Swiss-Prot record:
Keywords: ATP synthesis, Cell inner membrane, Cell membrane, CF(1), Hydrogen ion transport, Ion transport, Membrane, Transport
Protein name (record): ATP synthase subunit delta
Binding partners and assembly: F-type ATPases have 2 components, F(1) - the catalytic core - and F(0) - the membrane proton channel. F(1) has five subunits: alpha(3), beta(3), gamma(1), delta(1), epsilon(1). F(0) has three main subunits: a(1), b(2) and c(10-14). The alpha and beta chains form an alternating ring which encloses part of the gamma chain. F(1) is attached to F(0) by a central stalk formed by the gamma and epsilon chains, while a peripheral stalk is formed by the delta and b chains.
Family to which this protein belongs: Belongs to the ATPase delta chain family.
GO cellular component terms given for this protein: plasma membrane; proton-transporting ATP synthase complex
Main localization (coarse): membrane
Task of the protein: F(1)F(0) ATP synthase produces ATP from ADP in the presence of a proton or sodium gradient. F-type ATPases consist of two structural domains, F(1) containing the extramembraneous catalytic core and F(0) containing the membrane proton channel, linked together by a central stalk and a peripheral stalk. During catalysis, ATP synthesis in the catalytic domain of F(1) is coupled via a rotary mechanism of the central stalk subunits to proton translocation. This protein is part of the stalk that links CF(0) to CF(1). It either transmits conformational changes from CF(0) to CF(1) or is implicated in proton conduction.
GO MF entry, a single one: proton-transporting ATP synthase activity, rotational mechanism
Originating organism: Shewanella loihica (strain ATCC BAA-1088 / PV-4)
Membrane topology designation: Peripheral membrane protein
């Protein structure tokens, strides 16, 4: 099977373009998030594999989603059901989110540190990343004591490993070669 993002991209792009046109990016993000959660539900998953006809599946899916999905969102669900693609809704949501961040000139950065970062440290990291990436940065911070000290920052394709454990691993690799 083709990679999920390849299958999901046209749906996400169409939804995003429509959302931009209608000035409804936030509401579409919420709809897609909810639909993605429904598609990942353990009760719903078996039904997505072809147990029902596409129209029955679309009707059931829309009924489960209820008021959370508007008429245009329902149309997307129907098209995806007709094409047997409802299982890629989580990937559609992820891509939609990426398109939205790109459009808003935002990037989410994951910061894993050995200890809790202070607000000042978070601000410094955010400012440095914003300067480097020329985008607004939203930090998602977490703590991993196994890093010993330092941080690992991931923003899109950019990975900055400033952790002591990372430095020790690189040193070990150099010594072994």
């Amino acid at each position: 099977m083709a990679e999920l993002s390849t299958i999901a991209r046209p749906y996400a792009k169409a939804a995003f373009d429509f959302a931009i046109e209608k000035n409804a990016v936030e509401s579409w993000a919420e709809m897609l998030s909810f639909a993605a959660q429904v598609s990942e539900n353990e009760t719903m998953k078996p039904l997505l594999s072809g147990a029902l006809s596409s129209s029955q599946l679309a009707d059931l899916f829309i009924k489960v989603c209820g008021e959370q999905i508007n008429e245009q969102g329902q149309n997307l669900i129907k098209v995806m059901a007709e094409n047997g693609r409802l299982e890629v809704l989580p990937a559609v949501y992820e891509l939609f989110h990426e398109f939205s961040n790109e459009w808003a000139k935002e990037v989410e950065a994951s910061v894993v540190s050995a200890t809790e970062l202070s607000a000042e440290q978070q601000q410094q990291i955010s400012a440095s990343l914003e300067k480097r990436l020329t985008r607004k940065v939203k930090l998602n911070c977490s703590v991993d004591a196994s890093l010993v000290a330092g941080v690992i920052i991931t923003a899109g394709d950019l990975v900055i490993d400033g952790s002591v454990s990372g430095k020790l691993n690189r040193l070990s690799e150099k010594l072994q070669s």
